[in-house]
Every structure is written in C-alpha cells, then in structure tokens.
Amino acid sequence: MAGKKKSKSEALPLDLDNIKPMDHLQPVPKTRSSSITSIESADEPGTMKQVLLPPTIKEFDELEQFESFVRDETWDNDFDYFHGRLHYYPPFVMKSCQNNLEKIKPTMNKNSKKFRRDLQHHIQKHLIKDLEKCCGYELNFGKGEVVETDNKVTWKFKDETDHGFSKEEEDMYDRHWRLELDVSCTNESAMVDVEYKSIPM
C-alpha cells in the first residue's frame, strides 16, 4: 500500500538480546495532557476534578508483536501508561504441534496438568523475563496469585515497586506507576490470553 506509514515495530525488528535498559526517568510526555479529562467529584458534588483516561487497549495475536509494542511504549516515554492484550498459542504449544494448528491436541487446555505446568514455566522463565527486557526496567512480580474457576485459570501478577529507580528520581518527574499482568487459559483450547497494564499512580 503506497503511502502507508510503517510503525516502529515493523521498521525495527525485536532483538531481545540488544535492547538497552532505561538508565533514567524523563518528564511525562506533553501528549499525555490530551488524555486528561474533567469529571464531577463524587466526594464533593458540584466540583470538578481532573482524571487521566485509561489508555487505549492494543490487541495482538503474536507474542513478538506484543513484545515490540511494550518496547515501543518505553521508547516513546509512555512506559507508565499503556494497556496491551495478547491472544496466542505459547511457543511450547506450537512446538508440540510442529507449527500445525490442526495438530493441537484437544486435551491441551487448563484441565491438563502438563499444559498448566508448561504454561507456568513459560510465564516465569520466558514471558516475564522477556517483558522485563522490553520494558527496560526491573519487574518485581513475585509468585503472583492463581485464581481458578471451573472453566478458567488466571495467574495474576502486580508490581508496585520502584522498578529499580530511586524514590527521588520518581518524585522529581512524578513518575510512579504500577504494573498488572494477567495470564489466563480455559478448558476449551490451548489459546492463552495475556493482559498487561501500566498505570500511573
């Protein structure tokens, strides 16, 4: 398509081994002001207060696209204000079916102990570590919490730490943020859903 602007992710392929970490924080981008709106205060009816609108949700169906999005948000100085969703078959699923989706066993879902073990390994040893490289700062999710229903299991992680920056530096630029990572699968398929949010505090 002529004249189509390429996104940074298309222009710069993802290379997890050569992403430079963030050394220092910077001021909040000026474009953020367009995301601030006024609403009536629930505490004091008749008065208005300013709130930051939630970031636009970006949807992905490939892990590399999702990781490139996270990397690009850091490069754009929006590392503390984004929301991405990923719907994908994890690498261990693709390997087991030799990249042929028709060969995915119907038993590969949340009811399979092996599938859950492989998914938990993928989350801890690959997904979180790769996201940390893409973010360019420390992620401190810990073990997380597992929430299970009859048809779904979700691993929930939160990071409200300083992400490796000093409190003085965070205060200087007013850059305090928390991260939320939810990874879930169902009893219907091997498809995994990831929801990753960076929220200013």
Swiss-Prot record:
One GO CC term on file: plasma membrane
Region (Disordered): 1-45
Any one GO biological process: energy reserve metabolic process
Location relative to the cell: Cell membrane
The name this protein goes by in its record: Respiratory growth induced protein 1
Biased composition (Polar residues): 31-40
Mode of membrane association: Peripheral membrane protein
Family of this protein: Belongs to the RGI1 family.
Database matches in Pfam families: RGI1
Role this protein plays: Involved in the control of energetic metabolism and significantly contribute to cell fitness, especially under respiratory growth conditions.
InterPro entries from the UniProt entry: RGI1 (IPR022554), RGI1_sf (IPR038235)
Protein source organism: Candida albicans (strain SC5314 / ATCC MYA-2876)
Annotated keywords: Cell membrane, Membrane
Keyword Kinase on entry: no
Stimuli inducing this protein: Expression is under the control of RAS1. Up-regulated during colonization of the cecum and invasion of host tissue. Down-regulation correlates with clinical development of fluconazole resistance.
